[in-house]
From Swiss-Prot:
One of its GO terms (cellular component) is ribonucleoprotein complex. Keywords: Ribonucleoprotein, Ribosomal protein. It holds the Pfam family Ribosomal_L36. Belongs to the bacterial ribosomal protein bL36 family. InterPro entries: Ribosomal_bL36, Ribosomal_bL36_sp, Ribosomal_L36_bact. GO terms for biological process: translation. GO terms for molecular function: structural constituent of ribosome. It comes from Allorhizobium ampelinum (strain ATCC BAA-846 / DSM 112012 / S4) (Agrobacterium vitis (strain S4)). This is Large ribosomal subunit protein bL36.
Length: 41
């Protein structure tokens, strides 16, 4: 999982990326291609 300050560019890398909020953190998840997972930090 990548940890980035800004997820906007990462979200645009794949059309199946989803932006989700869990426990106060912001994540990018991708069921089709899990290598795009990222967390904002």
């Amino acid at each position: 999982m990548k940890i980035k300050n800004s997820l906007k560019a990462l979200k645009a890398r794949h059309r199946d990326n989803r932006l989700v909020r869990r426990k106060g953190r912001v994540y990018i998840i991708n069921k089709q291609n899990p290598r795009f997972k990222a967390r904002q930090g």
